[in-house]
Amino acid sequence: MREIISLNENWTLSFPKGERPTEQVTLPHTWNAVDGMDGNGSYLRTTGVYTRTFTQPKQPLAGGRTYVEVLAAALAATVKVNGQVATTHEGGFSIFRADVTDLCHEGDNELTIEVSNEDTPSMYPASADFTFYGGLYRGVNLISVPGTHFDLDYFGGPGIKVTPKPTEDGGATFEIESWVTNGEEAYTVMYSIEDCYGNEVASGVRPCDSTKVTLYVPDAQLWSMDEPNLYTVTARLQKNNETFDEIYANVGVRSYTVTPNDGFSINGVPTPLRGVARHQDCLYKGNALTAEDHYEDAMLIKELGANTIRLAHYQHSQDFYDACDELGFAVWAEIPFISVFKKDPSAHQNCRHQMTELIIQNYNHPSIMFWGLSNEILIGGICQELVDNHHDLQKLVRELDPTRLTTIAHVSNTPVDGPMHHITDVESYNHYFGWYGGKMEQNGPWLDKFHAEHPDICIGISEYGTEGIINWHSNDPQCKDYTEEYQALYHEHLAQVFEDRPWVWATHCWNMFDFGCAARHEGGVAGRNNKGLMTIDRKTKKDSYFVYQAYWSKLPMVHIAGRRHAQRAGETTEIKVYSNQDTVVLYVNGKEVGQQTAHRVFKFNVALEEGFNTILAVAGDVKDSITLEKVEKEPDYYTLPEFNERQEGVANWFKQVGSLDLKAPMEFPEGYYSIKDSMEDLSKNEEALALATRAVKLATNFDIKPGVGMWDMMKRMTPETMAKMINMPDGFIESLNAQLIKIKK
C-alpha cells in the first residue's frame, strides 16, 4: 500500500555564496520570512541548499518504488539523492516529484534540494509587485508505493480525474479516469463514490488498462457557494482480494454560466461573484504557511461574506484549495504570467508547463471555476508575440480542461478595442480609479460605457483598492492620504457600484490581507502593500472589511467605524456605522441620539461630551460599541507627514516650471528626450532620469532607481503610459515633457 512520510523535520540550510550562515530549519520554510517584508528595500535572492537524510521505506513485495514529493520550491529547484540528480524543476508554486528508487541504498540516504529564487530569462514570474520568497515553503514528502501503482509522474497530478455533471432528472454523472503505472492484466480499479455523510452512492470496476468509467448518482446534492456539498471518489487498485494502492478526490456537482448581460449563475441561480484576491504570506512567516494558516485565511474570507477568491498570482497550496471546496468559494486560479513579458521562447514553454501543472494538479477541485492566463502583462508594452502566446495558452487550457472558463486580468490602460480582447471566455480589468488615477466616481461610468460599447464581452473587475494604514486618520479623507477613513470611503462607493451592476460577472477587491512587497515604501510603511482589508498579521480588521461584511454577509452585523480615530476635536463629529440591517439606533453615553433607516452605511452627526464618550450602535439583535475622547486638538500623529510633503512637492514642481504654456500641444522634437521614452531609455541620461524619477515619486510616491525594487517591472514604461494609469495633477505630464525635450539624447 501507499505510504506517505513527511520529511519536514531535520533540514540543514546552507548558502553556497556565503550570504548567511548555515542553519537548522523545519519545513515549511523560506529564507525571506523577514527581509521579504521588513522594509529594507531589498531581500535575498540567491540559491539555498537544503539537506537531510532519510531511510528508504520498504514495500512488502519486491519492485516497490520511492518518490520524493516537493509541494513547492521557489522558484527553481534541483533534487539530488546521494549526490546524483533526480530531477530539476522551474516554477515556484506547483507540486513535482522524482522517482529516486534507483538512487537509494541501504541505510541513510542524503537528500539535497537546491532552491533558487533568482531571476532567469526562461522562467516566470519576471518582476511583479510582491516579494518572490525563496525556499521549500510548503513541505516535502517521501512516497512509497508498490511497483504497480496509481500514477505519480504526470505533471505532479493526483492520478485521478473526476468530472461530475448534473443531469436533468436531478441526478449526476461522474466521469472518472485514473492512470496506473506498470499495470498488469490481473489488476482492476474499483471506484466508490460516497456522499458527505460517508454513504456509498455508486461504485464501478474497470480493468487497469482501461480505467475510464461513467457512474450515475440519483438525487445528487449540488455544490454551490451557499451549500458546498462534496462527494468523495475513491479509486482502489486491486488484485486477488488485495488493495495495492488507493487514492481519492473530493468533488462537487455543479453547473455555471457567465453571460454579458446576466453575469454569473451557478446551478441556474444568478449569483454575482463578489469577493477578494489573496496572496499567500503572513507577517514574518513569509509564504511558509501551515495548513492551519491557510484554513484561517479562508475562514476570515468566509466571515467577510465573500463568495469568490482570486488566488493571485500563482498556484496556491492544496490546503487552501481544499478549504475553498469545503467552505464554498468560486475560485479564479492563475499562473505567474505577470507584468513583464519575456521574449525568450523557453519562457513561453515555462508558461505552458506551469499552466499544465496548475490544471492537472487541481482539476478535481469544484471551487475552481476560472483559469487565469495572465495579469497586467501589458505593463511593458504589447507585441504580436505576446498576443500569440495568449492565444496558445487559451488553446492549451481548452485541450486540458474544456469544462471551465478562462479569464484574464487586464492592466487599467489596456486598449478597450485592442487585440487582447476576445481571447479568453471572460475578462476583467484591474482599475484603481480613486487611487492611482482618476476619481472613485469614474468606476461606475467606465463599466457602463464598456458594457454598452462591448455588449458581447463578459466584464469583471479583477483588482481595485487603496492603501489603508490604521495609524492615519482624517475627518476629511482624501486620495493618497493613506488614512483608514479614505480606504473605507472608497470601498463604500465601490461596493455600491458593484451591487448596482449584477451583470459585472465578478469583482475581486485587492487585497484581503496586506502582503509583502520588499520594494515598496508607501504610507509610512515599508516593505508591504497595505491595500488589505486586514493587516498582514491577521490581527486587525480595518473598517473597510466591515463595509463588505455589511454588503455581503448574510449574518446580522453592525460595526461602528473610526474606533482607532479615538480622539476627536470640534463641536460635533461624524459617527459612521456599517450594518446589513435596515435600521440603526445610536446611543452616546447611554442616551439615544438618533435612529436611521439606510442601506449599509449610516451616518450620525453627534456632539461629544468633554473627556471619554461611550458610543453604542444597535441594529436589531446585534450591537457594537466604541469609546471616543473629545479633545481640543486632534494629535498630529494622525496625519502622514509625507502627505503634506508630497502636496508641497507638487506645488514646488509647478513653481520651477515657471511660465511654460502647459495648455499648448506637446512637442516631441527628434533627438531629444520626451515622455514617449521608456524609463530604461531615460536612464541613459542622468538629468533626464532625475526628472522622470522625481515626477514618478511626486505622482505615485514610488521611489524607482535602475536595478532596484520595481525597476524591472517599470523600466519599459513611458511617462506617457504612466500618466494614463495614475492620477497626475492637471498640466503635470505636460510640464515634464516640456523639461525633457530640452535634454539632447
Regions found by a protein language model. Name each.
Residues E3-G18, N40-G41, R45-D153, G183, ...:
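Accessory beta-strand-rich segments of carbohydrate-active enzymes
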Residues D102-D108, E177-T259, G611-F612:
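Extended acidic/polar, glycine-enriched regions
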Residues T214, P218, L222-M225, K576-E667:
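C-terminal beta-sandwich/jelly-roll accessory domains of carbohydrate-active enzymes
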Residues V25-D38, E118, M123, D129, ...:
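Extended substrate-binding grooves/exosites of carbohydrate-active enzymes
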